[in-house]
Swiss-Prot record:
Compartments where found: Cell inner membrane
Name listed for the protein in its UniProt record: Inner membrane-spanning protein YciB
Keyword list, A-Z: Cell inner membrane, Cell membrane, Membrane, Transmembrane, Transmembrane helix
Pfam family membership, one: IspA
GO cellular component terms listed in the entry, alphabetical order: plasma membrane
Record InterPro entries: YciB
Keyword Translocase: no
Membrane topology of the entry: Multi-pass membrane protein
Main location: membrane
Main function: Plays a role in cell envelope biogenesis, maintenance of cell envelope integrity and membrane homeostasis.
Family membership: Belongs to the YciB family.
Membrane-spanning residues: 3-23, 54-74, 81-101, 119-139, 149-169
Superkingdom of the organism of origin: Bacteria
Length: 181
């Protein structure tokens, strides 16, 4: 259910784009992101950092898209999120006591420090590649293709990466690792 909630602004953007175009879809995505952050805050009494991060980027780039009537700003949004995520994941390996992926997953799985750092690097590289791929699609194909890629390609590649990661993790865990759950 949380996954659907997290993708709420993207799905609305996709649907509205199909009927009304890029500018209306951008405005709706901005409102949807703001609504998402407010709803989450009311329901859970705190903010989800990723929602705030995404909201800030969509407000800046979406606002620029609407103000300048130029869709290139919104097309850069996924790349901005991917590359800033890559920077945060990479930096977490050097700042703090643990890589970010370990902080996110260690309650559910027990891995060696070496594997945590490899996994963190894998996510860093994944985000860099996804950001570059978004730009490639944005600059080499029309907006219809980019919008489809933004939803289906982004989600599809992320699910594929998580599946590959799961197979990798099975080689480096034992059944006791999952007893924490």
């Amino acid at each position: 259910m949380k996954l659907l909630f997290d993708f709420f602004p993207i799905v609305l953007f996709f649907i509205v784009y199909k009927f009304f175009g890029i500018y209306t879809a951008t405005a709706v995505a901005m409102v949807a992101s703001l609504t998402q952050v407010a709803f989450y805050r009311l329901k859970f009494q705190h903010y989800e950092k990723m929602h705030l991060f995404s909201l800030a980027i969509i407000m800046v780039l979406g606002g620029a898209t609407l103000f300048f009537q130029n869709p290139w700003f919104i097309k850069w949004k996924p790349t901005g999120i991917y590359w800033l995520s890559a920077l945060v994941f990479y930096g977490s390996g050097y700042i703090g006591s643990k890589p970010l992926i370990q902080k996110m997953m260690e309650a559910n799985i027990n891995l060696t420090t070496k594997i945590w750092y490899r996994l963190n690097l894998a996510w860093t590289l994944f985000f860099i590649v996804m950001g570059a791929l978004n730009l490639y699609v944005a600059y080499h194909y029309d907006t219809d293709v980019w919008v489809n890629f933004k939803l289906f390609g982004g989600v599809g590649f992320t699910l594929l990466f998580v599946l590959i990661q799961a197979f990798y993790l099975t080689k480096h865990t034992d059944e006791k690792s999952f007893e924490k759950q």
